[in-house]
């Protein structure tokens, strides 16, 4: 079976730290400040993102520069999926949710963003000292991580793939129900999508979108160490 491009797998980082960050939404300068404050070393460390690179913030155009950095590895978020589907999505709804920056790009620039975003994986799996850690934007549609990987590696398509993506990109059901059942066969699943005032976990699912994209209202970027599952709080 050929591995699906919707999954990206990473071996353990033997040189430095593996960190995960919540939704970015075009606030790359503040993200860089957060990384600097915890002495992030791009020669040794890796940064994984739960997606939503753009919309809402002032620096959305910088996303392509960040995607070119060999140590930066995001999954696709629901806002990133707007870019992937820019020719067919509900443009009015997108603009209401921060997508106006994309409408101001030239057609060639839009095509470049769309091509790069379509290459983003839906899921990332990182091997750590304690075992595998998964990353999705919102939630896992199966009780086991392997269940998701098997479906994606099998090349599921059409309505079935759309249903899987809908949960991975949009679902808030678990956190709304305070469901602590977790995901089997993972040390942890790290997600964003739902803003929280501090990092929280339900079972082994870690919610780390602490609102780095609304600093005016007290939000900040949390950086989660994937080996220890310890949140690092950059200086604010």
Segments from the language model and where they lie:
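N-terminal active-site segment of His-dependent metallophosphoesterases
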Residues: 1-63
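Beta-strand-turn-beta hairpins that frame and shape the catalytic cleft
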Residues: 12-19, 125-134, 202
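Active-site-proximal beta-strand elements of phosphoester/diester hydrolases
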Residues: 18-25, 133-139, 207-208
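Residue-level marker for buried hydrophobic side chains located in beta-strands
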Residues: 20, 47-49, 74-75, 134, ...
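Divalent metal-coordination and catalytic microenvironments
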Residues: 23, 52, 67, 77-78, ...
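Active-site environment of divalent metal-dependent phosphoester hydrolases
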Residues: 25-29, 55-58, 80-84, 141-143, ...
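Active-site neighborhood of divalent metal-dependent phosphoester bond hydrolases
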Residues: 60-134, 141, 155-171
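Conserved beta-sheet core of the metallophosphoesterase superfamily
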Residues: 171-234
